[in-house]
Amino acid sequence: MVRKIITYPNPRLFLNSEIVNKFDTELHTLLDDMYETMIASNGVGLAAIQVDIPLRVLLVNIFDENDEQKKEDLLEIINPEIIPLDEEMITCTEGCLSVPDFFEEVKRYNHILLKYQDRFGEFKELEAKGFLAVAIQHENDHLNGHLFIEKISFAKRQKFDKEFKKKKKNHKKEK
């Protein structure tokens, strides 16, 4: 089932998500719904808080070298812990399903170790580089109540705030 994605400035986006302790059918349904929601929204990642569920659950499904997004490449990440493996940073243009129509460059670690649990509670580790590492860090920020717009420069944040207010004003006029 496709769920509704909550968008900025909804205060629930700024909640810290809770650790998952039950790896049951309810969690599996959430993961399946999140995948359907992410694909229907043309996303490469989604955190549970974005569908208004404050649990430490996220999905990442980036496009492969053939520009295809395959379900077998889907990462279901529960209770993640991210460890930078070096100090090298990478700058990528990021967007967010909870901050629609805004894209900006953000610096993040280029090489990380991800420790997490899968849908069955099994502990896993994954070394990630480049865009995969960036996508994981972006989604993990959601679990800690942060959005990518908090990582942009002051000037770019002012630009975002101005565009957001203008869009909100135009939306009210349309109603």
Curated annotation (Swiss-Prot):
Cofactor(s), by name: Fe(2+)
Enzyme kind, highest EC tier: hydrolase
Enzymatic reactions: N-terminal N-formyl-L-methionyl-[peptide] + H2O = N-terminal L-methionyl-[peptide] + formate
Residues the entry annotates as binding Fe cation: 96, 138, 142
SUPFAM superfamilies according to UniProt: Peptide deformylase
EC number: 3.5.1.88
GO terms of molecular function: metal ion binding; peptide deformylase activity
Signal peptide: none
Domain of life: Bacteria
Active site residues of this protein: 139
Single Gene Ontology BP annotation: translation
Keyword set, alphabetical order: Hydrolase, Iron, Metal-binding, Protein biosynthesis
Cofactor binding note: Binds 1 Fe(2+) ion.
Family that this chain belongs to: Belongs to the polypeptide deformylase family.
Function: Removes the formyl group from the N-terminal Met of newly synthesized proteins. Requires at least a dipeptide for an efficient rate of reaction. N-terminal L-methionine is a prerequisite for activity but the enzyme has broad specificity at other positions.
Protein name: Peptide deformylase
Organism: Campylobacter jejuni subsp. jejuni serotype O:2 (strain ATCC 700819 / NCTC 11168)
